[in-house]
Every structure is written in structure tokens, then in C-alpha cells.
From Swiss-Prot:
The keyword Repressor does not apply. One of its GO terms (cellular component) is cytosol. It comes from Escherichia coli (strain K12). Changing H43G: 250-fold decrease in catalytic efficiency. Induction: Weakly expressed in maxicells, part of the metY operon that extends to pnp. The keyword 4Fe-4S does not apply. This is tRNA pseudouridine synthase B. Keywords: Isomerase, tRNA processing. Residues 124-152 are annotated as: RNA binding.
Length: 314
């Protein structure tokens, strides 16, 4: 039986999209997938429609390694409206409570300090976490509140930017699983006035260079430019991509000789010199260091395959 024809291009890499405000992360993903005519695409950590900023879009084989970005730290710029609390903790929700803003600068500094370091956070009902197989926001839209357990997060840095009138601006560098809306809602309660997010921008994900972010508008301009020059759009679009193994850039590299990489790519653990004693590794082959997948050091010190790059015939 012949293999079913794959739709789209076998293009592999990560695009650092600057997501526009008012668009869901999935809508942004689908637009990028169509522009690149990619056979597969996935994003790593959704941004709310209200939010803008860095949304890594993994194309092709890079989708296999997107999970490593989900575990990475992130940096945000947020502006909160003080004195108003909403049901979603952001400006897209309904105002449920209004209170005067009466705290002092000293009280603000003390409240902010309670959110630095290792803390416990109860996720918002308006989140994509699941309870009994159903997303929390689906319960919330039905007016149902379900129990949520506090989860450990780390706020590595919380910078005070400004406080003018009923607006408070902060910059937050945090671990995976941190909900900025929840931090703002909890901060508003500590200050006794309530608060919600009116502006949120993701400044950075992991160690990705901010200057490599691109907008949907720029991608469309490149497609038009390619048409005018009568060249394939891929010639202008593909250089924007980060390497497919960039989501796992924090892991050490093990380079296999071609004689060993054949066995590794067939699913077999292999021995090699220079491997760490334990943990996950990025595996490359040959003198050019071509990335072939992720491995893990097994109990016998061998590099065992965990996720492999598949090369499809043209």
C-alpha cells in the first residue's frame, strides 16, 4: 500500500512570532502554518488574546521538541488597573467589584515583595488547566467553580516600573506555569483595592533573542515581495526560523560518529565517549553536527533515544 501523501512542506524550525493583540494563540498558529505551507505546526505556551509578544511556533519536526520550551522561564511586562476586579482577572472580563485605591508606597513595596521567589499560586478558573478532563475556563463560562490545588512557581525577578493614578506597571521574570493574571489579582487583594490586567506583553521565552521576533504583517510582506520578484516565498521566509533543536538548547550535546548514529536512529541505545553521567542530551551526528534527536543516559551509561528526527523523502 502506498504511503498517504503529506500535505504541505517538510519545513523544520521555530518561528518567534510577535503575536498581535486580540488574536488567540491558535489563530496565530494557523496563520503562520498557512503562510509557511507547513505540514505540521504547534505553539509552546499559549498567550491570552489580550496579550502580545513572543509566541514560539514550532514547524515540522520541531513540534517534537516543543515540550522543552514549555518548561522554560519567561519574562513579561504587565500593566494593571487598580481599584477594579474582574471575573477573568483581565480587561476581557466583567467588573465584579470596585474599591478605592488607598495604599501607600511602603504598603505597595511590601506587597510586591511577597510575590518574589518561590511561592504557591492557585490557578485562575479562566485557564486551560484541566479538571476531570475538562478545561477550567469551560467550567467558568458555565458559572461553575471547581477545586484547584496551589502549585509551586518561582518569580525570579519582579521589577516595579511605575505607579500613576490607578495604573501599576511591572516586569516579571518567572518560571513555567506562572499566571500573570493571577499574580495581579492576588496583588490587588493584598493591597485591598482589587486589580486586573489591562496590558500584557511577553518579552522573552527561554534564551531566544528578542530581535528575532517577527510579526504576521512582516511575513505577509515577504510573501508579496517574493511574488513580485518571482521567487519561492520560502527563500525569504525560511531564514527567519530558529533551528529545530533550539527548544532544547539548555541540554548538553552528545555527538555520535556516523557508525553509531545509525543504531541510535533505529531506536537502539549506544555507547559513546564524552557523554554526561545522567539526564537528557541533544544528539548530533558526524563532523557537521547534524541534530538527530533527543536522548537520555540510561542505567548502563548509554545514550538511549527518546525523540528522533524523521527525514521524509522528497
Amino acid at each position: 500500500m502506498s504511503r498517504p501523501r503529506r500535505r504541505g512542506r517538510d519545513i523544520n524550525g521555530v518561528l518567534l512570532l510577535d503575536k498581535p493583540q486580540g488574536m488567540s494563540s491558535n489563530d496565530a498558529l494557523q496563520k503562520v502554518k498557512r503562510i509557511y505551507n507547513a505540514n505540521r505546526a504547534g505553539h509552546t505556551g499559549a498567550l491570552d488574546p489580550l496579550a502580545t509578544g513572543m509566541l514560539p511556533i514550532c514547524l515540522g519536526e520541531a513540534t517534537k521538541f516543543s515540550q522543552y520550551l514549555l518548561d522554560s522561564d519567561k519574562r513579561y511586562r504587565v500593566i494593571a488597573r487598580l481599584g477594579q476586579r474582574t471575573d477573568t482577572s483581565d480587561a476581557d472580563g466583567q467588573i465584579v467589584e470596585e474599591r478605592p485605591v488607598t495604599f501607600s508606597a511602603e504598603q505597595l513595596a511590601a506587597a510586591l515583595d511577597t510575590f518574589r521567589g518561590d511561592i504557591e499560586q492557585i490557578p485562575s478558573m479562566y485557564s486551560a488547566l484541566k479538571y476531570q478532563g475538562k478545561k477550567l475556563y469551560e467550567y467558568a463560562r458555565q458559572g461553575i467553580e471547581v477545586p484547584r490545588e496551589a502549585r509551586p512557581i518561582t518569580v525570579y525577578e519582579l521589577l516595579f516600573i511605575r505607579h500613576e493614578g490607578n495604573e501599576l506597571e511591572l516586569e516579571i521574570h518567572c518560571s513555567k506555569g506562572t499566571y500573570i493574571r493571577t499574580i495581579i489579582d492576588d496583588l490587588g487583594e493584598k493591597l485591598g483595592c482589587g486589580a486586573h490586567v489591562i496590558y500584557l506583553r511577553r518579552l522573552a521565552v527561554s534564551k531566544y533573542p528578542v530581535e528575532r521576533m517577527v510579526t504576521l504583517e512582516h511575513l505577509r510582506e515577504l510573501v508579496e515581495q517574493a511574488e513580485q520578484q518571482d521567487i519561492p516565498a520560502a527563500e525569504l521566509l525560511d531564514p527567519l526560523l530558529m533551528p529545530m533543536d533550539s527548544p532544547a538548547s539548555d541540554y548538553p550535546v552528545v555527538n555520535l560518529p556516523l557508525t553509531s548514529s545509525v543504531y541510535f536512529k533505529n531506536g537502539n541505545p549506544v555507547r559513546t565517549s564524552g557523554a554526561p553521567l545522567e539526564g537528557l542530551v541533544r544528539v548530533t551526528e558526524g563532523e557537521n553536527g547534524k541534530f538527530i534527536g533527543m536522548g537520555e543516559i540510561d542505567d548502563e551509561g548509554r545514550v538511549a533515544p527518546r525523540r528522533l528526527v524523521v527525514e521524509y523523502p522528497a
